[in-house]
Swiss-Prot record:
Matches recorded under InterPro entries: NifW
NCBIfam families reported for this sequence: PRK00810.1
The protein's name in its UniProt record: Nitrogenase-stabilizing/protective protein NifW
GO biological process: nitrogen fixation
Keywords: Nitrogen fixation
Subunit details: Homotrimer; associates with NifD.
Function in brief: May protect the nitrogenase Fe-Mo protein from oxidative damage.
Signal peptide boundaries: none
Pfam family, one: NifW
Domain of life, per lineage: Bacteria
Organism per entry: Paraburkholderia xenovorans (strain LB400)
Family assignment from sequence similarity: Belongs to the NifW family.
Amino acid sequence: MQSFVQQLKALSSAEDFLQFFGIPFDQKVVNVSRLHILKRFFQYIRQQDVLPEGDEAALFASYHALLLKAYGDFVISTPAQEKVFKVFQDTAGRQHVSLDSLRASLPARTVA
């Protein structure tokens, strides 16, 4: 039988994690926020001062609660509001590009 950590390593998608931990989910929420949910989940894990060691059932319960919390964040909010990724953190999700910088980025035109 695989250890808890080995089983976690085999998971890859948000759906895999949610199913593994027995968390019911709305596919529409996951379709929009899958990467955000997983990143938030791992942020929550890193924020824990102490996680149960040597007790796989307690570790499973802790991870279950953290994933449920991460998923819940995106049920009641949007990725843009949660700002998990840097692109949403910088300048409130807005980026100003001047017309001059766009012109400068275009290749020079040659007259035929």
